[in-house]
Amino acid sequence: MTATDPAPTPLAQGWCALSLLHGRIEAHIERALQAKHDLSVREYSLLDVLSRQHDGDGGHLQMKQVADAVVLSQSATTRLVTRLEDRLLLTRYLCPTDRRGIYTNVTEAGLKLLAQARPTNDTALREALDEAARNPELAPLVRVVESLNVPA
């Protein structure tokens, strides 16, 4: 940026701060989950989303729903699901009423790993937020995140 470049608008500054906060939180959680459970943030998120879907053992979603839930393209989601399926943490099966549909289901091993990883995720999230709260640029965003009362 040179002296003649226009200053970012408050909206752009806010977006940059939000992006910075997200990146720092995700990186901190990623390191913790990888070190203790050999899971990426995306893998953890997918197991978490599927664990909240209830249809008998574990949970299931169609692949498009999985992609939307973990905010990935369908091709990236397929690769993510394949990695977890190879580790026996997920299974895929055809939809019984629409043979074109493929469901993804979390396994008992996936639920067990998720239960072990959840405290690590929560602790890392708290640590990342506490660290970010010490940054004057990020502190207001941290307060907003902490004040949210989103239903589970």
Please annotate each region the language model reported.
Residues 2, 82-139:
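Charged, amphipathic alpha-helical coiled-coil/dimerization segments
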Residues 20, 24, 28, 32, ...:
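Solvent-exposed, charged/polar functional surfaces in cytosolic regulatory/catalytic domains
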Residues 48, 115, 142:
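A cross-family signal for key residues in well-ordered alpha-helices
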Residues 27-73:
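N-terminal helix-turn-helix DNA-binding core of bacterial DNA-binding proteins
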Residues 138-152:
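Exposed, interaction-prone assembly regions rather than primary DNA-binding/catalytic cores
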